[in-house]
Amino acid sequence: MSYIRYIKQTRPNTAVAFFSPSVEVIAKLDVYKASGKIESYTLDTISTNQLNKEIKIVFNSLDSFDEFMTEELIIASATKRGEYCAENFISYSLEDDLI
């Protein structure tokens, strides 16, 4: 079964930049994708009003997701995302789905 992680951000206006993953995080996503642990990912799905952004990562299993989430780089990125969003009045949510 696949495991999907959604990261959704809502910004107050278009003058505020969304938080985006670093080059290093994208490289880590690519490593997991090359190994088959990530089936696909999209990083920049933007709503028509330009105020909402969705990141979607499809893992091949819950175990692969759990492994990914223990990576120091990913933990640090999650901390940076939380800080950035708080400083810039961006609300965000994490949603998971098992399919």
Q: What is the role of each PLM region?
A:
Residues 1-70, 90-99:
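Short S/T/G/P-rich N-terminal loop/turn motif that feeds into the first structured element of a domain
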Residues 77-95:
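Conserved short beta-strand edge segments in small beta-sheet-based binding/regulatory domains
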Residues 65-67, 72-76, 80-83:
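Short, compact, well-ordered microdomains
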